[in-house]
Amino acid sequence: MDIIGGQHLRQMWDDLADVYGHKTALICESSGGVVNRYSYLELNQEINRTANLFYTLGIRKGDKVALHLDNCPEFIFCWFGLAKIGAIMVPINARLLREESAWILQNSQACLLVTSAQFYPMYQQIQQEDATQLRHICLTDVALPADDGVSSFTQLKNQQPATLCYAPPLSTDDTAEILFTSGTTSRPKGVVITHYNLRFAGYYSAWQCALRDDDVYLTVMPAFHIDCQCTAAMAAFSAGATFVLVEKYSARAFWGQVQKYRATITECIPMMIRTLMVQPPSANDRQHRLREVMFYLNLSEQEKDAFCERFGVRLLTSYGMTETIVGIIGDRPGDKRRWPSIGRAGFCYEAEIRDDHNRPLPAGEIGEICIKGVPGKTIFKEYFLNPKATAKVLEADGWLHTGDTGYCDEEGFFYFVDRRCNMIKRGGENVSCVELENIIATHPKIQDIVVVGIKDSIRDEAIKAFVVLNEGETLSEEEFFRFCEQNMAKFKVPSYLEIRKDLPRNCSGKIIRKNLK
């Protein structure tokens, strides 16, 4: 089923400007409280100016341009400005340090970088010491260093006409971006995403939360992440809705922002939901217009129920990954929830559970979650310049191996168990980290939790729990282990406990387990 009709991203923005004109398309709020608003017409003009800027700097169809930016209007301008001229965006996690950023520059073949002054010294060093194809840097800040090969993004953009000067032939099969995975267990891989992928993501995600043109979709997710781009931004723009991009997440400020912009849809990761729940209760907890909150793994049933009850919203499960572009398994609009199920496969997808020999398993049996889509259309096209890694996860007929374990019931509802790499082998038993984390998270003193396996000469692996406590709380080992013994099988009880101030996380809020082993 082709729901795109051959329309690439350039055509999308020209149509949106014509249809929605002066309706608000984008609102960006900086950490300092500065707010920028753009109508669909104004945003399309800014995108055109940005496309013209890149053209004047020698960027042509197929060239790669890296973005190392926090959430800001310039990210949106660049994303779609590059797409309009057939160039390819390479977003870089704004939290990455020198070595990781240099690695992505080298492996993406990016020849131009857009960043801010705070990151410039790092890239200046990379240019001097690393072999990259980077030949020019645009800074979004006003102040400029007196260096060759550096220019002001804003000054150059504002000098450009609001109509597009360079419009090469485009196809929905053309690559729009290369998004490098977070790489919690290995070097990140470049996920190739096409114009079709992004257009499909917009329509699919809008369907997922029944989005309309009078909706306001607010997100604090980082713009360089697939969730912000495909679940939020593309959904909002495809529906003609208003997209609100907040620079940084703050649990104290979040509900005020939701109320201020009259948001009707938002998205959350577990860390956000947990930190929102530990904020002091307020009479304004339900004084908002939110009807749906898209959320991503993992939350316990108790956490979900408590959040919905306190804030009066519906949580919509969305299971996916960078390679699937969108949440390919989730709660459908109007469906009743069947927690702890993660939902059913969405339209245009098939899903099944397979064993270690790649054979489908019957209902109730645990195996690998596999998804069937169309490469370059409903799932990613390939890993950039890495056919071996592509072949390892993507079959020729479109079946994608997620690396996650789960099972399915008789009615087609799927249940997530864990990442295969997060299964602990303890004395012949397989123990799911997620299962233990969901149990331990119910302890009233615990704010955040991660469980990992560590080497054990007798039982293969021992279980260690890292916890972050709620503010002002103390927790003894005796109390912790007693709680575990009362709530889980003996062989699942952790052997070790470490209390920390925080846990290491990547850009999407996922805990980096390798840093704890």
Swiss-Prot record:
InterPro entries: AMP-bd_C (IPR025110), AMP-bd_C_sf (IPR045851), AMP-binding_CS (IPR020845), AMP-dep_synth/lig_dom (IPR000873), ANL_N_sf (IPR042099), CaiC (IPR023456). One of its GO terms (biological process) is fatty acid metabolic process. Its EC number is 6.2.1.48. Keywords: Ligase. It catalyses: 4-(trimethylamino)butanoate + ATP + CoA = 4-(trimethylamino)butanoyl-CoA + AMP + diphosphate; crotonobetaine + ATP + CoA = crotonobetainyl-CoA + AMP + diphosphate; (R)-carnitine + ATP + CoA = (R)-carnitinyl-CoA + AMP + diphosphate. GO terms for molecular function: carnitine-CoA ligase activity; crotonobetaine-CoA ligase activity; medium-chain fatty acid-CoA ligase activity. Pathway: Amine and polyamine metabolism; carnitine metabolism. The keyword Ligase applies. CDD domains: FACL_DitJ_like. The keyword Mitochondrion does not apply. It comes from the Bacteria. Belongs to the ATP-dependent AMP-binding enzyme family. Catalyzes the transfer of CoA to carnitine, generating the initial carnitinyl-CoA needed for the CaiB reaction cycle. Also has activity toward crotonobetaine and gamma-butyrobetaine. This is Crotonobetaine/carnitine--CoA ligase. It comes from Escherichia coli O9:H4 (strain HS). The lineage of its organism: Bacteria, Pseudomonadati, Pseudomonadota, Gammaproteobacteria, Enterobacterales.
